[in-house]
Amino acid sequence: MFLEKDYLKLKIKQFLPEFLSIYTPSGEEYKAKDFFEKIASELDLSLQVTSTNSYLLGDGDILLVGHVDTVPGFINPKEEGEIIYGRGAVDDKGPLISMIIAASILNKNGYSVTVGALSDEENKSKGAREILRIGKKYDYIIVGEPTNTFGVVVEYRGVIHLDILCRARSEHSSSATSNLIFEIAKKIINTTRINTGYDDVSIVPTIFKSGEYLNVTPSNAVVHFDIRYSVRNSKDQIMSEIHREFEGCEIHEVEDISPVKVDVNSDIVKVFMRSIIKENYKPTILRKRGTSDMNILKDLALKGILAYGPGNSSLEHTDHEKISLDEIFIATKVYINAIEALWPKM
């Protein structure tokens, strides 16, 4: 009964609109506590609320992990037929509901799994870092991000966030012999790399601050760079080039998350590909240009990690987030089939 389409769709319609009605931007995941207590009780899953306001449902050696937080900007949930709209429908509440329903069915069938509904993924990944600090290892970790329902993500790029502070002597603008803004602008132009290929380093300035007075050249300037790089790039080389260009400036590394890449011939990837085929769809291998909790959690996976989930990834972070019952139904079946196939390999 549990795998019948009507039953699964009924559960999705029961849980997802309510979840979407709870506005949980990063830092406000605590608002979902009552919801998780309710869903855990109804689906007979144990529940642990952590210090970062993440929620752990069930207890097993396979971890299904998604995130509770969304980007800012509430969207009133609505339903049109079998389409559900709302902030987080795609990223990441739709995939998370799919995982929780799959986990409840798997646990009833004797396959013990844990669902991690983590906090702060859209910010500094406090939830994932907390799981990393706890240190429990899992045989397999599946990260529930929207992968267009038929995609399997085997690679995410890493990220480096840099704040660079440069100083100079300020002068009256009418008789200035130099200008820090002009000098730093040249360095920014020399450093920036946009519209690059996947395996090329992307270096994008996102914040620039300088100057205090209308008639005085600035004494300091701050630029923030968002740097993305793949496993084929060297962080040391990237940083060496930055230090050379901004010699004499203070360079502060705000965040560094290393890239992650999974062997396409690994058991977990092949099993998920077969599970999608089993549902009569053609799977695709994906490489994501951004970064996710998969980068942070990779060292906790003893045998394999990947990302898979329902939802059109092009709708992430937009005001048009929507997901269909069919997408979540298919993903739920894929999660169940894949974990049942992985179980003998543990």
UniProtKB/Swiss-Prot annotation:
CDD domains from the UniProt entry: M20_ArgE_LysK
SUPFAM superfamilies attached to this UniProt entry: Bacterial exopeptidase dimerisation domain (SSF55031), Zn-dependent exopeptidases (SSF53187)
Primary enzyme class: hydrolase
Major location (coarse): cytoplasm
Keywords: Amino-acid biosynthesis, Arginine biosynthesis, Cobalt, Cytoplasm, Hydrolase, Lysine biosynthesis, Metal-binding, Zinc
Co-factor requirement: Zn(2+); Co(2+)
Annotated InterPro entries: ArgE/DapE_CS, Bact_exopeptidase_dim_dom, LysK, Peptidase_M20, Peptidase_M20_dimer, Peptidase_M20A
Coiled-coil regions, chain positions: none
PANTHER family xref list: [LYSW]-LYSINE_[LYSW]-ORNITHINE HYDROLASE, ACETYLORNITHINE DEACETYLASE
Family: Belongs to the peptidase M20A family. LysK subfamily.
Stated name of the protein: [LysW]-lysine/[LysW]-ornithine hydrolase
